[in-house]
Structure formats: C-alpha cells, structure tokens
Amino acid sequence: MRLEIQRRFSDLDPLGHVNNVAYHDYLQEARMGLISDLDAVVNDDYAMVVVSQEIRHVKPLEYSRKPVVIETRVTDMARTSYSIVYRVLDEKGDIAAEATTRLAVVDPVSGRPIRMP
C-alpha cells in the first residue's frame, strides 16, 4: 500500500529537517491506513498493540509542499503477531527511511496474546 502524507511545518527541527519523532507519526498513519484497508481494525474481540518499532534513517527529509510517500507491506506473520515494513520516500522517490513495526494481537480485556483472527 502507498500513502501520501503532507509534511507540516511543526514536523521540522531547528535545522529544517523533519524531526525523528515525526517519522513515528508518519508510520502510525501508514499503519492505520494499511490495517483499515485490510479490514482489521480493532473490535470487541481483539486489539493490536505495537511490540517494537525500528527506524533506519537513510537521508534527511526537508520541508516540501510535496507529500512524503510511505510504502507498507505485511511480513513475518506468526500465530499471534506480524510485522509491517515501511519505506519512507521523499518527493524524488528516494528512500529517506526504512522501518519495521512488530504488532501482537491481544485480548482487549486481559491484554494477553491471542491467535490472529
């Protein structure tokens, strides 16, 4: 899946680069878009929680009116968890960052891992 996200002035650090914290927001938007497209949003039977997230910054993103493109795909599916991998692309299509998020499916009451639906 590909999602375009507009950079905000508030995303910038004093050097004019997109701050590393903003990448987490971008990844969350892309993750929720992917989960929604897969019709796997949270319901009363299960919830998805982030277990880990790793971002490798390749090159700085600077402010631009053109959106950042986030490419996402699901990988590494297990019984109670899965990973989403991302590529963050600048306005030229160059890779600015690569990331992975590991999510677990849990019972919303107990918080314990459960088998994926």
Model-based region annotation:
Residues 21-24, 55, 80, 84:
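Intrinsically disordered, low-complexity segments enriched in small/polar residues
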Residues 1-52, 108-117:
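Hot-dog-fold acyl-thioester-processing enzymes
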Residues 34-69, 73-78, 96-98:
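Hydrophobic beta-strand-centered segment that forms part of the acyl-chain substrate-binding groove
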Residues 1-3, 62-64, 75-117:
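HotDog/MaoC-like acyl-thioester-processing domains
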